[in-house]
Swiss-Prot record:
Belongs to the BICDR family. It comes from Xenopus tropicalis. Residues 56-275, 340-413 form a coiled coil. This is BICD family-like cargo adapter 2. Residues 440-450 have a biased composition (Low complexity). Residues 286-318, 440-459 are annotated as: Disordered. Keywords: Coiled coil. InterPro entries: Spindly/BICDR_Dynein_Adapter (IPR051149). The keyword Magnesium does not apply. Residues 286-300, 308-318 have a biased composition (Polar residues).
Length: 475
């Protein structure tokens, strides 16, 4: 094989196998050094072998190059398929990201609306909290005033107790003085001991009574607090009921407006029916239908006037709560008004049933006469409006009954609170009057009596001590 069958040029052979070009001089140098007398045939034979070896190596390199080109084409094809798959996945991911972005935007909008609602609720809660804080501050102020009065009463009781302890100390000193003459005053000493024991027992009783009074006062304060909470709740319920009544009145006004429009349409339809009665032979049937419509319109106007009068009488029945002697009369009037409202509700039930019967009868007449579809629709609309109006009036009456019952509960709670406060004030006034009278009588007795002997003064102290103990025992 020559150069054209193997390698393309010597430069290519030198590029791939440079060791061949380096090998020939080495062989030649060795041959010159070792075998200087070797002939030219051996050198040519060696060169031929080297050329054959180089040709075989070139052939192997070409085969390897073909394999590498095929592998390169396969890798390029695989790379192209991989790039197409990557582009497809990128497109799918882009679509998914757009869908997710739209979903995220919707979620963000929902979250923003929820955040706005939460802010509104937070503002409402803050306003309610401020209102509760003001109410609790007023309640705390009232309770602090009551506690101050109780502290003053306890201070007075402690002063009396200190006076008794001072008298007991003086008695002990006198007892020590009298131990010298025990033989002479033995019966008096015995009586003093018994009186001392009685004083100690009465002191214990007085302490127990003061504890009972404190417990009763605490119970009264707890009842007052619970009553105030009930009053606040009833006031809130009353405000809710008022707002519901206003909403019902607005709805009733809307229904009245729609009723006026329906009456105008009905009047126009009646004129058309009157025009058609002159053209057709069904005068008797249409005249009966006309009279039925007029009767139902008159009944509707009568019910409208009566219901408006009832609504005015109900709305004018709001009473102001006064803590006076007229509370019992107000309660009785509220009960009577509740009974009247219940009777009105039953009457409205009966009227609704009558209206439904009238509607059914008019429907039957319309089906028998085969009148115009516009007339049917107008009558049906009017009947539906009447039924809705009756239902709204019934709901309004029910709300009025609930409101009156809440007013009754509020008045009863206020009465209980007033009675408890009056009893507490009366008890405090009685205690103050009795204490003042006792102190004045003691001062008058001390100023009127002349100075006495030590024995008489001792007996006077015993009598004074007995009066004070009898006073606390009576309390």
């Amino acid at each position: 094989m020559g150069w054209n069958g193997g390698l393309t040029s010597p430069s290519m052979e030198e590029h791939f196998y440079p060791f061949l070009m380096e090998r020939s001089p080495s062989y030649m140098g060795e041959d010159e050094e070792e075998h200087g007398d070797e002939d030219l045939s051996l050198v040519l034979e060696r060169k031929d072998k080297d050329l054959l070896l180089a040709a075989e190596l070139g052939k192997a390199l070409l085969e390897r190059n073909d394999q590498l080109m095929k592998a390169k084409d396969a890798l390029e094809e695989e790379l192209r398929e991989t790039l197409e798959m990557i582009e497809q996945e990128k497109h799918n991911m882009r679509l998914k990201m757009e869908v997710q972005e739209s979903e995220w935007r919707a979620q963000v909008a929902d979250l923003e609306s929820d955040l706005a609602e939460a802010r509104l609720q937070m503002q409402q809660l803050l306003s309610e909290q401020r209102e509760c804080g003001r109410e609790s501050a007023s309640a705390v102020q009232e309770l602090s005033e009551q506690n101050q009065r109780l502290v003053e009463q306890l201070a007075q009781a402690s002063q009396v107790e200190q006076a008794i302890t001072l008298e007991m100390k003086s008695l002990k000193e006198e007892n020590r003085d009298l131990t010298i003459s025990r033989g002479q005053f033995a019966p008096c000493l015995q009586s003093l001991r018994s009186e001392n024991a009685l004083l100690l027992e009465k002191k214990k009783e007085m302490e127990s009574q003061t504890k009972q009074l404190q417990e009763e006062n605490d119970n009264v304060q707890n009842q007052l607090i619970s009553a105030k909470e009930g009053v606040f709740q009833l006031q809130r319920q009353k405000e809710d009921a008022k707002s519901q009544v206003l909403q019902l009145e607005l709805e009733a006004q809307k229904l009245r407006d729609s009723q006026r429009t329906l009456q105008l349409q009905l009047k126009e339809l009646q004129d058309e029916l009157h025009m058609r009665d002159s053209q057709f032979s069904m005068r008797g049937t249409h005249s009966s239908l006309h009279s039925e419509i007029q009767q139902s319109t008159a009944v509707q106007n009568h019910e409208k006037g009566r219901n408006s009068a009832e609504t005015q009488s109900i709305t004018s029945g709001y009473m102001d709560t006064y803590l006076t002697e007229r509370e019992g009369d107000l309660l009785r009037e509220n009960e009577e008004q509740t009974v009247r409202l219940q009777d009105q509700v039953t009457m409205q039930h009966i009227e609704i049933t009558d209206l439904r019967k009238e509607v059914q009868r008019l429907k039957d007449l319309l089906q028998q006469n085969n009148a115009d579809s516009t007339v049917k629709q107008a009558v049906l609309d009017r009947d539906e409006a009447l039924m809705k109006k009756a239902e709204l009036e019934q709901e309004l009456a029910r709300c009025q009954i609930e409101k009156e019952s809440l007013n009754l509960q509020l008045l009863s709670t206020i009465q209980q609170k007033v009675m408890l406060s009056q009893e507490l004030e009366a008890w405090q006034d009685d205690m103050q009057i009795v204490i003042n009278q006792q102190l004045q009588s003691q001062k008058q007795q001390e100023t009127q009596k002349p100075p006495e002997s030590p024995q008489n003064s001792f007996l006077r102290r015993d009598s004074k001590r007995g009066k004070i103990l009898s006073f606390f025992k009576n309390i």
